[in-house]
């Protein structure tokens, strides 16, 4: 199974890149994950945000592998606690398909991207910087892996 994290945005802050690299390294023993960065569209007072969303959506669609199982990070998605995410990870691994996590830009995902999503995952009702979301996602995937392998990292229930 190939696992991708397709994230809109480039040039993340150093501390985000360092945190992502650390959890990516830890996760790689259990679930090899490839980060694919999508160039964000121009934004500003003279740019149409809907057009930016559509442009980014086309770039995301072009980056998808064939027949992926797409999990879209979306505020309207299903919130999961760590144990529930671990259960979903076990399910996703058993599908035998390429697993793709999709992180949109500041305004979210295009309708085209939402339409191909097999699942929508919400990190909760908070508004988070989309650059920070990639770090949170990789840490949560690592946490899910430690739950499944009974590693002491997760100190939940």
Swiss-Prot record:
GO molecular function: rRNA (pseudouridine-N3-)-methyltransferase activity
Subcellular location: Cytoplasm
InterPro entries: Alpha/beta_knot_MTases (IPR029028), RlmH-like (IPR003742), tRNA_m1G_MTases_N (IPR029026)
GO cellular component: cytoplasm
EC assignment: 2.1.1.177
The keyword S-adenosyl-L-methionine is assigned to this record: yes
SUPFAM superfamilies attached to this UniProt entry: alpha/beta knot (SSF75217)
Keyword line: Cytoplasm, Methyltransferase, rRNA processing, S-adenosyl-L-methionine, Transferase
UniProt binding sites for S-adenosyl-L-methionine: 73, 104, 123-128
Top-rank taxon: Bacteria
Alphabetized HAMAP family for the sequence: 23SrRNA_methyltr_H
Subunit annotation: Homodimer.
Annotated PANTHER family: METHYLTRANSFERASE, RIBOSOMAL RNA LARGE SUBUNIT METHYLTRANSFERASE H
Family classification: Belongs to the RNA methyltransferase RlmH family.
Function: Specifically methylates the pseudouridine at position 1915 (m3Psi1915) in 23S rRNA.
Protein name per the record: Ribosomal RNA large subunit methyltransferase H
Gene: rlmH
């Amino acid at each position: 199974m190939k696992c991708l994290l397709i994230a809109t945005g480039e040039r993340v802050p150093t501390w985000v890149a360092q945190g992502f690299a650390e959890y990516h390294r830890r996760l790689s023993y259990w679930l090899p994950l490839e980060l694919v960065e999508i160039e964000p569209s121009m934004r500003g007072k003279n740019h149409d945000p809907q057009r930016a969303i559509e442009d980014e959506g086309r770039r995301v669609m072009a980056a998808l592998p064939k027949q992926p199982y797409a999990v879209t990070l979306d505020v309207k998605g299903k919130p999961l606690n760590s144990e529930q995410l671990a259960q979903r990870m076990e399910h996703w691994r058993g599908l035998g398909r390429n697993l793709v996590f999709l992180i949109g830009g500041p305004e979210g995902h295009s309708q085209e991207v939402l339409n191909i999503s097999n699942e929508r995952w919400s990190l909760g009702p908070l508004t988070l910087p989309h650059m920070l979301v990639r770090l949170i996602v990789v840490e949560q995937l690592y946490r899910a892996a430690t739950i499944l392998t009974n590693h002491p990292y997760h100190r939940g229930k």
